[in-house]
Amino acid sequence: MERESDRVRALNQRFYDAVSRQNLLGMEQIWSHATHVRCVHPGWTLIEGWEAIRDSWRRIFQGALCLTVEPEDLHVTVLGPTAVVTCRERISSFTLEGSTMQAAQATNIYEKRAGRWELIHHHASAIKPPAALEP
């Protein structure tokens, strides 16, 4: 029997697959469309509501020729109808200006409504490379 944490882990992977495929339709199926959803991209301020979040992803996808976000060091905690996933993201982006690689620490919060898990919060903060932290 599949555990709730396994379901959340699979949905979280679908989220990152949709990001890497720049698939807005996939994002629409994963995100809750409730008014209380929130998102913070690295270097951005808080975005509130599904419409604004969808527009933010659209802008990110339009600016990238190729985007890959790979989660690693994943931790899933299920607390009743709420699940919290923390992970590191390895982000590769290719634009007309060139390519970038960075890392971020992310928290994704899922809510179970009517028997279905939906993403209600995504927060990713850039991680400085260890060499940049040295005095």
Which positions does each model-derived feature cover?
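A beta-strand edge to alpha-helix "cap/lid" segment located at domain peripheries
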Residues: M1-S32, H36-P135
